Amino acid sequence: MTKYIFITGGVVSSLGKGIAAASLAAILEARGLRVTLIKLDPYINVDPGTMSPFQHGEVFVTNDGAETDLDLGHYERFVKTTMTKRNNFTSGKIYENVIKKERRGDYLGGTVQVIPHITNEIKRCIKLGADAFDVAMVEIGGTVGDIESLPFLEAIRQMRIELGSQRAIFIHLTLVPYIATSGETKTKPTQHSVKELRSIGIQPDVLICRSEKPLSMADRAKIALFTNVEKEAVISLEDANSIYQIPMILHAQHLDEIVVKKLSLEAKQADLSEWQRVVDMQAVQTMTVKIAMVGKYTELNDAYKSINEALLHAGIHTETKVEIIYFDAEMIEKHGALLLESIDAILVPGGFGERGVEGKIKAIQYAREHKVPFLGICLGMQTAVIEFARNVVGLTGANSTEFNKETLYPVLGLISEWMDADGSKQTRDESTDLGGTMRLGGQYCHLAEGTLARKVYGKSQIIERHRHRYEVNNKYVDSLVKHGLIISGRSADNSLVEMIELADHPWFLACQFHPEFTSNPRDSHPLFKEFVFAARIHHQEKDKK
């Protein structure tokens, strides 16, 4: 019988509900419980797939092909449960489901309202995602007091009544600001946030108080008094040097024990040695490398959240401090790739649209000609193919039909059909809705023997997650290969190019998929680990010159 932990946030947004939820989930998992996490987002978009990264940050793709909130990336990095389309629901998706039911006549001509129809659908989706787990942690997006969140808060209020206090508890995350000029922490915002929550019928069982410094026992007692929460259940969560320390910080204050008791769970003692090992390894850094991230959303780090974390994981497992230097591709387009002279490796991430493409191509040309380690992801692979076609094969003006439909040499184009991981055929065309034209989720990839890709992965077949519309045009593959491009990875049916590399380069790899989505701090991802290791070697060779 699944137990539920509902997590809300107050005072301000971006406090780290996702990290806190994932950290608690990691501790409960370390106690032998089967844990899943569900994110409820209050925006009206059906999913974040068509939202600007500047608005939303990265879109995290699950193995079953759902385009979801970036918090699901945190969830997968902290727990061993693989997230699915059942782990993220938006207001848009909830309303879409209800409207479809209304159109079918499921409500027998009744008036469809927020209560009970929308709230019932929210509860149904929560239970669907929680099925077969011991504990389901449900994070409510937004901040208490926002009008958009009200249906979700009402739904979880009802669930607490229906399930009882031993099957559902509330955790509220708040901010306790520190005023440097007076040297005081201020508890009033937390008091008001809880008051707002209680006004809609929700009494928190636990408070997690985000602060710059650890809260004193006096502050915790004061917060407990004014919020009607037990003093032991007021948890201080100060800023940490690494997010991977947070499970230990929460465990040290017995948060997991409080949760286990309140939910009457049978669980062994937590073994956090795995997380302690990650933190200890992160502290050992024998070298610093500078990796250039050449993209178009560089003003917002969250746009590349999983890549940032994957590079951090690689650094942990190679004793390397990875310093990511963000370069706006348009700046390289204007001022040239010499901006990259001090860099140890170059990474071109995914993206959509024409803006910045020529700058990415210049960066790739620099990496190829100057033998700088290079990793291209999704659009990064596509621009690597364009660069090679133009500057090595000699196909002047070669391009993707995404950027120039009239190009004489369409080395990349919209592929109308491909085979899914389960062997079924998938199709798309130019008239399909944007949300339906993507090749999404886990796909098989066969790696060619004797290639760098095969050496990096150490096996002949892999599954990686995709999110793209365009593919390498097979018409030009023979010409590309003839001039030295190696096709090191192909799709399950051998029809699509998935990975490329160069024979006359120390470390040049590009992939059509997104390896960052399957990296975690415990193991790292082999592609990122070897990329960072190549950056170390390049750094050492530069020092010798």
Swiss-Prot record:
Pathway: Pyrimidine metabolism; CTP biosynthesis via de novo pathway; CTP from UDP: step 2/2. It comes from the Bacteria. Mg(2+) binds at D71, E139. One of its GO terms (cellular component) is cytosol. It holds the Pfam family CTP_synth_N. Residues 1-265 are annotated as: Amidoligase domain. UTP binds at S13, K186, T187, K188, P189, T190, Q191, K222. Its EC number is 6.3.4.2. L-glutamine binds at G351, L379, G380, M381, Q382, E402, R469. CTP binds at S13, D146, I147, E148, K186, T187, K188, P189, T190, Q191, K222. Gene3D superfamilies: 3.40.50.880, P-loop containing nucleotide triphosphate hydrolases. Keywords: ATP-binding, Glutamine amidotransferase, Ligase, Magnesium, Metal-binding, Nucleotide-binding, Pyrimidine biosynthesis. Allosterically activated by GTP, when glutamine is the substrate; GTP has no effect on the reaction when ammonia is the substrate. The allosteric effector GTP functions by stabilizing the protein conformation that binds the tetrahedral intermediate(s) formed during glutamine hydrolysis. Inhibited by the product CTP, via allosteric rather than competitive inhibition. Residues 290-541 form the Glutamine amidotransferase type-1 domain. It catalyses: UTP + L-glutamine + ATP + H2O = CTP + L-glutamate + ADP + phosphate + 2 H(+); L-glutamine + H2O = L-glutamate + NH4(+); UTP + NH4(+) + ATP = CTP + ADP + phosphate + 2 H(+). CTPSs have evolved a hybrid strategy for distinguishing between UTP and CTP. The overlapping regions of the product feedback inhibitory and substrate sites recognize a common feature in both compounds, the triphosphate moiety. To differentiate isosteric substrate and product pyrimidine rings, an additional pocket far from the expected kinase/ligase catalytic site, specifically recognizes the cytosine and ribose portions of the product inhibitor. Homotetramer. Catalyzes the ATP-dependent amination of UTP to CTP with either L-glutamine or ammonia as the source of nitrogen. Regulates intracellular CTP levels through interactions with the four ribonucleotide triphosphates. This is CTP synthase. It comes from Legionella pneumophila (strain Lens). The gene is pyrG.
